[in-house]
Every structure is written in C-alpha cells, then in structure tokens.
C-alpha cells in the first residue's frame, strides 16, 4: 500500500442552455479551468424548450469533442421558464410521510397539473409542530428534452439544477435581488435568508426590445415583485438598500449596468466569483455555470 497516495482530482463540466448559445465552464479540484460559449441556431431553444433533440445533441457532442470537455461529471441547468414554486406551512411530519403530504399540497397550490411537473422540495425551517417547506415544480417536457439531447451526445447528466437556484448559489448572499438578463430571457430572484423567497422568469423572445427596453421591463417587474413580496409575506420586508446583483450577457456592457443603476433606487452590484478563477472570466455571464459548479451532489 502506498503511503503517499495522490489526491483525487475532481473535474466537473457545467453546461447552460440559453436561447442564443451553449455556455460551458469546467473546473478542476474546485478551480475554474476553462470556459466558453457556442452559438445556437435561432429557434432550436424556444420558451426554455429544446425543439429538436437530435440537432441539439449533435451540437453538444461537437462542443464537448472540440473543447476536450469531460463527460463523466456534467452538471446542467434548466430554464426557470414555466417553473412554479411555493413556500407552504405544513404539519411537522416524519420523512416517511412527507413525500405524500407534499404531493397533496402541490396538487392544491400549484396552478399546473402536477402530473406535468417534476416536483422537488426542501424543508426551510421547523418550529414546534409546524414546518415551512419550499416546493418546486418544473415542467417535465423541459427536463425530458434536455436529458434526451445529452444522451444523444453520450452524456448522462451527473445532476441538473434550475437556473434561478444556481444563480442564488453563485451570488452567495443572505439577502439580495438577483437580476439575470439575456437576449431573450429575464429572470428576477428575491433572496431572503439565503433562500428563494420569490422567483420569476419571463420570456422576451416575441417582444423585440432594445437593451434599454429590456432593462425598463426588468425595473417594472422588479418593482411589482418587491411590492408583492412586502405586502403578502411574513417576516422582514425587502428594504430599499437591498442590492441588486446583475448577471447575464446583457449586463456585460457598462452602459447597461449604468442604465439600470440610474433607473432604480437601490444599490446595483456585480457578483464576484464564488470559486477561484482567472481574472478575465466574465463572472456575470457565467454566473449560472459557477452556481452549478457549487452544487453538492
């Protein structure tokens, strides 16, 4: 037996499917090693759904071959479009009974048939005979199409995660507003106590907005979400000094950052990388990838 065993090197490849492109980021032993993007034909991804599984699978296969990316430990994101989440108060139950109880609550609370969703949940807090549970429903067709595309590329995903949850993990703040703005998609996450208090994702595909127009839409949706949260939730409200952390390709522009900062009455910041990385990494653009790399599986 060797007394000096080499330390195990963990290589993880994260993959984000946007409407416009694929974004990859690879880590080795917890450090960012390489990253990049590959443009997608228009219409191949629409409303978060891969419309041609075979074509997408071939593109992913070519990307992984061309960039020499590892296929053994791949963590992929799923769009937040059409996903539904609820925070509910339930009786405190043993684990053996929780699954059925969550399904019953989801059937009552979710606006979509739960047969069309993959459900997951996490207990947020327990007090006395009650517990607060975060329930998430993601459309089955979104996940199924992505799994099939990865299989075409000879990849069995090690894990998958919803894009808004990956962004919350990447930003790593107890209280924050996370704004993600891409060419065809807008996402806003209100984070309280490190947990998703309110999450919304909007498609911009059919709106033909300029970048300032997209930011105006972001500001409008943000104001409505904060007002809704503060009026309807228990606990401390989201204050005027809670910062907005901007992510996504649109905010790679200094002009876009300044436009938002001038339009909202709260601090606007860029996130820093939660893991060691080269200085030249555009953290905001690859924030979802960074959050995927932090996922514990």
PLM region spans:
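Hydrophobic/aromatic-enriched cytosolic interaction surfaces used to assemble or bind macromolecules
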Residues: 1-297
């Amino acid at each position: 037996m060797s007394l000096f065993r080499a330390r195990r090197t963990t290589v993880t490849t994260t993959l984000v499917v946007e409407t416009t492109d694929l974004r990859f980021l690879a880590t080795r032993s917890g450090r960012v090693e390489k990253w990049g993007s590959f443009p997608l034909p228009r219409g191949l991804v629409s409303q978060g759904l891969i419309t041609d599984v075979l074509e997408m699978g071939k593109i992913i296969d070519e990307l992984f071959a061309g960039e020499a990316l590892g296929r053994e430990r791949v963590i992929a994101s799923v769009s937040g479009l059409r996903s539904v989440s609820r925070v509910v108060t339930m009786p405190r139950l043993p684990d053996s009974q929780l699954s059925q109880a969550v399904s019953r609550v989801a059937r009552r609370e979710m606006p979509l048939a739960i047969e069309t969703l993959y459900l997951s949940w996490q207990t947020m807090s327990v007090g006395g005979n009650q517990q607060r549970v975060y329930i998430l429903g993601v459309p089955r067709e979104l996940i199924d199409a992505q799994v099939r595309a990865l299989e075409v590329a000879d990849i069995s995903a090690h894990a998958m995660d919803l894009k808004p949850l990956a962004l919350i993990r990447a930003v790593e703040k107890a209280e924050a507003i996370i704004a993600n703005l891409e060419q065809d998609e807008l996402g806003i996450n209100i984070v309280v106590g490190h947990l998703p208090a309110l999450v919304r994702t909007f498609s911009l595909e059919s709106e033909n907005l300029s970048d300032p127009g997209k930011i105006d839409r972001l500001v409008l949706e943000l104001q409505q979400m904060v007002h809704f949260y503060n009026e309807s939730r228990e606990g401390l409200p989201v204050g005027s000094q809670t910062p907005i952390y901007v992510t996504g390709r649109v905010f790679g522009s200094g002009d876009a950052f300044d436009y938002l900062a001038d339009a909202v009455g709260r601090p606007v910041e860029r996130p820093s990388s939660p893991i060691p990385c080269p200085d030249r990494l555009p953290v905001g653009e690859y924030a979802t990838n960074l959050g995927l790399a932090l996922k514990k599986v």
